[in-house]
Amino acid sequence: MKLYVFNPDADMALGNNEENYMAPATIRRMAEDLALLPIWYARPGSGVLAPSAYNADYLKQMQQLFRLDVHLVTEPELPDYADVRVMPWGWNPAIRKRMLKGGVLERNLPTPDALDKYRMKAARSNALAFRALFYSNKIDYTCGDGCCLVEADGGTTAISLDIIGRYKEGCVFKSLWSGSGKGLCWCRHGFTKNVSDWCSRALKENRGFVMEPIFDKVEDFAMEFYSDGRGKLLFVGYSRFVTDD
């Protein structure tokens, strides 16, 4: 059986990379409020990890309306599902420890070495290669020119000169791992001390960050894909949302 877990702090936890990571209160609240989100994409016969107190009635209503073949699993019940295949929103050392402590068999969880490889694949820096590919092949309706990776040995002085020379309209710095609108530093008024401090922290903590122009965007959306783990990748839909910036 598959057990789905909604952990919206997944990318932030990857940035921290510690098994005892604790997300900010607002993100923890989001995880609680949206714990049943996986019922809409879980495979039939699966379980969804969520507190029962205020989720059971809602799930029952949705099951009646949409004939959803999923059931609720609470944290205290995890030992009864020790042999499940955990399907989190995203893997990181913290969710691995949480599942292991809850009673899931270790053989059903990714190894620390596998998590290290997963972390590197999840970094924003990997997206730069795709952007460059789209740009070099002149694929219509894509952007990517002007985006770059700043690494630890570059220093903030080089970053400052790069901004002055290339980003007349300002730029945005992005942590290699972050989520829910976190990990961004907007540089609209020059390389100020606050911007410099942010860059220094990012270089110290993650040894790099992504820098890109502030695009004249129309709206925000993400493309969602599913990988079966055997080389097959499927496009499953869009995630459209609204942001302040």
Regions found by a protein language model. Give the residues of each.
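N-terminal-proximal low-complexity accessory segments that begin disordered
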Residues: 1-47
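Short acidic/polar capping segments at secondary-structure boundaries
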Residues: 93-94, 176-180, 215-217, 243-244
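Conserved N-proximal alpha/beta basic substrate-recognition cap immediately N-terminal to
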Residues: 27-41, 49-159, 178-179
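A short acidic-Thr-Gly-centered motif at the start of a beta-strand
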Residues: 157-169, 202-203
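Glycine-rich phosphate-binding loop of ATP-grasp-fold ATP-dependent ligases
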Residues: 146, 170-195, 222, 245
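Phosphate-binding site of ATP-dependent enzymes
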Residues: 195-244
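Extended, Lys/Arg-enriched charged tracts that mediate electrostatic binding to polyanionic substrates
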Residues: 65, 161, 176-182, 188, ...
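A structural signal for short, well-ordered beta-strand segments and their strand-loop junctions
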Residues: 4-5, 48-51, 87-90, 172-174, ...
